[in-house]
């Protein structure tokens, strides 16, 4: 049994993953605000399961050296800087530990067991506190070196005088969106909850209001959010020969969101046949928010020959 842990900007989720990659005993705790509390929380989670597990698999945002289990920068969690996560937990609990980027974990789970199976080039966009990206080919993650063979070569259509300004505008929009974190699902739900006058952020209530067409302002906010994600997808497609993109994170359970992103993506394509590539499929991760846990466990198993 593997203890899989998904470190997010809002919650730390965890569960037990068996040899058939089924998850049980899932739970979550709020992500601590300090490094000391972070260590205490992780150690409590592991201690509670230590007697029944053979290893620890961790999905974490940011820049990760997976071989060493070292976090260079933990995404939007400010205190996760230069953290030897794997070695410290191994030293404390005498258990093998593997750490992988959370979006890579989601993409790996979908490539091996879910919606990105049997593709030469697929991507997972994980929408949470921030936005994560994982690229896969068949059952494997694409490394910075291997990804170069999937770069899209310029076509005559894409180099046309009408296409180039649009592509530049698209690129700059996407860059600003990433810098400002406009793709954040947590940010969208927070803004939408405030718009509805809710006492606290409530994703299900937000989407119920969207589906019930309760507020024109909310509809516009939702349309803008879907447009931001569609721009990210189209930007990715302009660089890589993608066959499919899946949307991950807890928000991916909302069918209305996937439909909204797909509609916005089709709208971007409608008047731009000169882009030089065809539309691709956008759908939810098969395992939704569990993709991170399953992918981390799968990475642990493959690295330890289990």
Give a label for each model feature.
Residues 30-33, 79, 148-151:
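A short acidic/small-residue loop/turn micro-motif
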Residues 97-103:
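General beta-strand structural signal in soluble alpha/beta enzymes
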Residues 1-55, 65-68, 89-94, 112-121, ...:
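ATP-binding/phosphotransfer module of carbohydrate and carboxylate kinases, centering on a glycine-rich
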Residues 4, 100, 108:
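Generic enzyme active-site microenvironment
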Residues 27-29, 75, 145:
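Short hydrophobic alpha-helix segments
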Residues 107-150:
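Hydrophobic alpha-helical segments and helix pairs
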Residues 60, 129, 249-250:
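Short secondary-structure boundary segments
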């Amino acid at each position: 049994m593997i203890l899989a842990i998904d470190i997010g900007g809002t919650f730390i989720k965890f569960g037990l993953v068996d040899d058939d990659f089924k998850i049980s005993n899932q739970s979550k705790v709020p992500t601590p605000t300090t490094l000391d509390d972070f260590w205490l929380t992780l150690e409590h989670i592991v201690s509670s399961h230590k007697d029944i597990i053979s290893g620890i698999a961790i999905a974490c945002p940011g820049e990760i050296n997976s071989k060493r289990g070292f976090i260079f920068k933990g995404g939007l969690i400010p205190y996760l800087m230069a953290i030897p996560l794997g070695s410290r937990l191994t030293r404390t609990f005498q258990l093998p530990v593997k750490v992988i980027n959370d979006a890579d974990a989601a993409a790996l789970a979908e490539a091996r067991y879910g919606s990105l199976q049997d593709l030469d080039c697929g991507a997972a966009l994980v929408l949470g506190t921030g936005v994560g990206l994982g690229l896969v080919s068949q059952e494997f993650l694409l490394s910075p070196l291997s990804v170069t063979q999937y770069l899209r070569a310029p076509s005559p259509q894409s180099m046309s005088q009408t296409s180039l300004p649009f592509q530049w505008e698209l690129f700059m929009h996407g860059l600003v969106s990433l810098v400002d974190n406009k793709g954040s699902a947590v940010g969208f739900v927070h803004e939408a909850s405030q718009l509805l006058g809710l006492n606290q952020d409530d994703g299900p209530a937000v989407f119920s209001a969207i589906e019930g067409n309760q507020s024109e302002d909310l509809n516009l906010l939702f349309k803008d959010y879907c447009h931001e994600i569609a721009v990210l997808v189209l930007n990715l497609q302009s660089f890589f020969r993608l066959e499919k993109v899946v949307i991950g994170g807890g928000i991916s359970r909302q069918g209305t969101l996937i439909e909204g992103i797909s509609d916005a993506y089709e709208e971007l394509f409608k008047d731009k046949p000169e882009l030089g590539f065809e539309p691709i499929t956008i759908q939810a991760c098969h395992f939704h928010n569990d993709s991170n846990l399953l992918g981390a466990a799968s990475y642990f198993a493959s690295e330890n020959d289990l």
